[in-house]
Each structure stands twice: as C-alpha cells, then as structure tokens.
Curated annotation (Swiss-Prot):
This protein's encoding gene: cbiN
Lineage: Archaea, Methanobacteriati, Methanobacteriota, Methanomada group, Methanococci
Keywords assigned: Cell membrane, Cobalamin biosynthesis, Cobalt, Cobalt transport, Ion transport, Membrane, Transmembrane, Transmembrane helix, Transport
Cellular compartments annotated: Cell membrane
Keyword DNA-binding listed: no
Disulfide cysteine pairs (residue numbers): none
Assembly with partners or alone: Forms an energy-coupling factor (ECF) transporter complex composed of an ATP-binding protein (A component, CbiO), a transmembrane protein (T component, CbiQ) and 2 possible substrate-capture proteins (S components, CbiM and CbiN) of unknown stoichimetry.
Name by which UniProt lists this protein: Cobalt transport protein CbiN
Protein family membership: Belongs to the CbiN family.
Isomerase listed as a keyword: no
C-alpha cells in the first residue's frame, strides 16, 4: 500500500475518533444541544409572551426516534439524488470524449 493511502486512512480514522474522544457528555443538562428551534421559541416567548403560532403541524412523529429516522431518510434521498446527478453528468462527459 502506498504511503499516501496509509496517510489518508489514518486521517479518516482520526476524523472519526477525534469527536468521540473530545466529547465528555457535559452540557446536555444545561441545554447546550437544544437546537435552533427551541432557542427561537424561547426567544419569541420572551419578546412577545402573547404570541400565538399561525398554524400547527398536521402530524407530529410519535417519538424522537421516528423523527430522527425521517430526517435520516430525507438526507439519504437527497444524497441519492445528488449522487445520481453527478454520475449522470460524469457519464455524459465521458461519452463525449
């Protein structure tokens, strides 16, 4: 195996392990990872306590796991579409040459 391949594999391993090593679990109780939606909702209620939303969602996932599944499915479908687009254009370019 060439040296540049070994370096690339080591780089990928470091990129995978670094966040796991750096994460200590601190801050979850303080809401550091609450997300933008929760922070925006809190800020709106602070600015205007009588604010009423214009509409409600017609369906809400029964659990956080299903919500995460739907988000991951949406990301996978988007990745497939983008991959198809790149593959189609690459094949079209190679066909010209």
């Amino acid at each position: 195996m060439e040296f540049k391949h070994v370096l690339m594999i080591l780089g990928v391993i470091i990129l995978i392990l670094a966040p796991l090593i750096m994460y200590s679990g601190l801050g979850e109780d303080e809401g550091y990872f609450g997300g933008a939606d929760g922070a925006a909702g809190d800020l709106i209620m602070e600015i205007s306590p009588n604010y009423e939303p214009w509409f409600e969602p017609f369906w809400e996932p029964p659990s956080g796991e299903i919500e995460s599944l739907l988000f991951a499915l949406q990301a996978a479908i988007g990745a497939i579409i983008i991959g198809y687009f790149f593959g189609y254009n690459k094949a079209k370019y190679e066909d010209k040459n």
